[in-house]
Amino acid sequence: MADYKEYLDKIRNSQLLYFDSFPLDMTSCEYNVHLLLNKMAESRKSYLLLMDNERFSDAVLIAGHLLENAAVINYISASLQEDNTKQISKYLARETVQTLCDLFKFVGDDNVDAETQETIDFIMDDFKSRCDIVVLKKAKQTHEELVQVISKATTNSEKFKIIKNNYELPVVEDYLRPLRTDLSKFYGFPDIDKKLVLFYSSYCKIKHCGAAMYAPILCEDKVVMNKSQYRDLSPIVVWMCLEYTEKNIKTILNKVCQKR
């Protein structure tokens, strides 16, 4: 298997599509896929910049972000291929729940400006129409009843608590597992699934723990960290995600456009 520099060269030569603008008549699936493709293209540039400057642990964060985007694109594409509208509805509904929770958490109970309130109202309308039984947990109340409870809540923190306790949030592993399976079949390298699990575990540790996850060694009054672990870990993951998405991009875009 190639060393990390060879994979970096392959990543440099990647030609993943980037969209400067989106058509106004896009469906939700089209918009999400185009947006995720742009995020992957932008992540590729940031990743190479960090690797070239030996910011290996920071590069892992970008690589993990790229992997998650590739996984969601693959998930949407597979659901469309199987004509599994329930899975697509579930994905979009969970994302709506997450967006609404993030908004309520970010805004808090302070007075909000008109523009922010307009955004909240817009997402709430989407939530009311989209987040029915598809993402409702085993609650005693129906979606319609919970919408009424939320509308009567006087603070954003109350609304946040009601939504979080009664509706499903996105589960990253649901998106990652199918991509791991598909990459293993596509490339046929030994232990690809294990490498991806190891990488994602390391990504989550860096993401949530930062520098505290390192085991520094004191040497001549200097803190020395093992960079090679992160230097060698991420390039193959980034390359596989980019190449696999590139090779399937026409099929993916055809699928989402057919659902207009």
Question: Where are these predicted regions, by residue range?
Answer:
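Long, hydrophobic/aromatic-enriched structural stretches that serve as scaffold segments
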Residues: 21-79
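Internal, hydrophobic cores of structured domains that mediate oligomerization or house catalytic pockets
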Residues: 63-64, 70-110
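Secondary-shell segments that build the walls of catalytic and ion/ligand-binding clefts
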Residues: 1-31, 94-239, 244-260
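Residue-level signal for alpha-helical context at structural boundaries
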Residues: 58, 77, 84-85, 214, ...
